[in-house]
Amino acid sequence: VGLYSNYLMLSNKLLLIEQIIFSSLVASIGNVIARDSPEKRLQIFQAMQSASFIFCGIITAGFGLLANDVITVWLGKEYTFSMLTVIAVTVNTYFSCALQPLWIYRDATGLYMKTKYMMLAGSIVNIVLSVILGRFMGIAGIIFASAIARLSTYFWYEPKLLFHEYFNSRTTGYYISILKNIGLLACVIAVLSYVFSGWVVTDWMTLILKVVVTAAVCSSIFVLAYCRTEGFQVIMNKVRQICGHTGR
């Protein structure tokens, strides 16, 4: 548990960037839900989702590629997890990132009142799977159980409810977009893992250099992949607002 808390802290710090940006949109989304047509609501949601895909690519790839290096330099190699466990934490990090727009809409629409029993079901599934997978896979199994519980319950139920009640649309395109993002992300992590396989991090200087290179490469790939989407414009507008407030 102590080892996992270190990885969880790293994951949460990375996710905080996206959470700050998206949480500031809750009031605006409430106005969209109250005033605009289902088509406009869907358009705004898709813009937020494509923005989250950029964050997902950078945050999740960065975590998967660098988590063990950070822990090694920070605490020592004896405090690192196996690659299987890092993958499990990375999967959970991805879903926490990719589901941000859905959670924002859930809060803005009050949809959580209709999903509370599904959330309870997810918790029960998580507990059962944690016991089963934990016996066979250790800490990795317990962490994977959380991801499986999400996938088997509210991951499919909440979008179905949101799209049906507020967008008058099917969820097919939503799931396809997530699969495409996962595919691109998996390719990026696999290729960079191979490219960086000979890069041994031994101190803070080599770690910082690897972080900078990883961030630059991942940012370039995912910005290029989504730069034509409305979500990219959402990010740029928020960056301009932050820079504008800072400059005053």
Identify the role of each PLM range.
Residues 7, 11-49, 103-108:
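Helix-loop junctions and terminal segments of transmembrane helices
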Residues 58-77, 132, 136, 194-199:
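Short membrane-interface helical motifs at transmembrane helix boundaries
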Residues 1-12, 78-84:
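Interfacial/gating helices of multi-pass transporter permease domains
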Residues 113, 120-155, 159, 169-172, ...:
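Membrane-interface helix-loop junctions in multi-pass transport and translocation proteins
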Residues 63-94, 167:
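Interfacial segments at transmembrane-helix termini and the short loops linking adjacent helices
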Residues 166-170, 193-248:
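Membrane-proximal transmembrane or re-entrant/amphipathic helices at the cytosolic face
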Residues 8, 44, 49-64, 140-165:
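Short alpha-helical transmembrane segments in multi-pass integral membrane proteins
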Residues 90-122, 136:
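Membrane-interface junctions at transmembrane-helix termini in multi-pass inner-membrane proteins
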